[in-house]
Amino acid sequence: MSEVTGDGAVAAEAIDPRRFRTVLGQFCTGVTIITTIDDGVPVGFACQSFAALSLEPPLVLFCPTKTSRSWAAIERSGIFCVNVLAEEQQSTCARFGSRDPDKFAGIDWTESPLGSPILTGSLAHIDCSLESVHDGGDHWVAFGRVSSLSEIREERPLLFYRGQYTGIEPDKTVPAPWRDDLEAFLTTSSEDTWL
C-alpha cells in the first residue's frame, strides 16, 4: 500500500513501479528508433525517451536502459541516428521494441553521413555523435551532438499514449471538443522559441 502525504501525493519511497509507469503513460510521446553500426552490423532499438536538449550547441538526449545490448553497441561506435517514426510505422516500432536478434530483417535503410542507419519511411532523422553519458538510475542519459538533419516531411508522427500507439487527428479544422484549447495552441502563428 502506498503512503499518501497530506496533499494527496504518494511518498517517493513507497512508489510502486507499475503505478509509476501507468502515471508516466499519461504523457503522450513520439516514438524513435535509435540506430548505429557496430562492427559492420546495423543495430537499433525503439526509444520513447528522446528529447531536444540545446540549440547552441545543437544537442539531443535519449535514455537507454543500462542492460540494453543496442546501447552497448552505440557506446562502442560513438555515433547514432535518431529516426523519428511516421504514423504508419507501427510494425517497425514493434520489431525494434522486440528481442528479435535481427531487427533489420526486411527493413530498408540507407547510411547517414556519420554511418548510422536511416530507416526508409521515417518522418525525420537526426545524425549524431555521442557527446557524453550520465547516470540516470536504471537508465543512462546519453547526450548527442547533432551533425546533420533530414529535410522536413508532411506526414504525421507515430505517437504512444497510455500503452498504445496513437496519432494526430487527420482533420485539424474540426477538432474534438476536448481539444479546443490544444488546437488553439498548436495552430498559433507565433515563432517556435520553446527551446
Swiss-Prot record:
Catalyzed reactions: a reduced flavin + NAD(+) = an oxidized flavin + NADH + 2 H(+)
InterPro entries: Flavin_Rdtase-like_dom, HsaB, NADH-dep_flavin_reductase, Split_barrel_FMN-bd
Family annotation (SUPFAM superfamilies): FMN-binding split barrel
Disulfide bonds: none
Keywords linked to the UniProt accession: Aromatic hydrocarbons catabolism, FAD, Flavoprotein, FMN, Lipid degradation, Lipid metabolism, NAD, Oxidoreductase, Steroid metabolism
GO biological process terms held by the UniProt record: lipid catabolic process; steroid biosynthetic process
Family matches, as PANTHER family: FLAVIN REDUCTASE, FLAVIN-DEPENDENT MONOOXYGENASE, REDUCTASE SUBUNIT HSAB
Stated role: Catalyzes the reduction of free flavins (FMN or FAD) by NADH. Subsequently, the reduced flavins diffuse to the HsaA oxygenase subunit.
UniProt protein name: Flavin-dependent monooxygenase, reductase subunit HsaB
Originating organism: Rhodococcus jostii (strain RHA1)
Gene: hsaB
